[in-house]
Curated annotation (Swiss-Prot):
MF terms (GO), sorted A to Z: protein transmembrane transporter activity
Coiled-coil region: none
Protein name per the record: Sec-independent protein translocase protein TatA
Gene Ontology cellular-component terms listed: TAT protein transport complex
Gene: tatA
Organism for this UniProt entry: Syntrophus aciditrophicus (strain SB)
Length: 61
């Protein structure tokens, strides 16, 4: 995962814990989760728009 192993992830987590404190972590996690959910929803909607905007083939008579 981007060359980041478990020890590096733990160090990053400890630094975040020190900066924001234990009380803010659930708030931050919820905000990140909502952001990811909205991003996925928007990307799925753009795929649906692309499929609907394709011109339909008209067959000659």
């Amino acid at each position: 995962m981007f060359g980041i192993g478990m020890p590096e992830m733990l160090i990053i987590l400890v630094i975040i814990l020190i900066i924001f404190g234990a009380g803010k972590l659930p708030e931050i996690g919820g905000a990140i989760g909502k952001g990811i959910k909205n991003f996925k929803k928007a990307s799925n909607e753009s795929e649906e728009i692309d499929e609907n905007s394709r011109p339909k083939k008209i067959e000659p008579k």
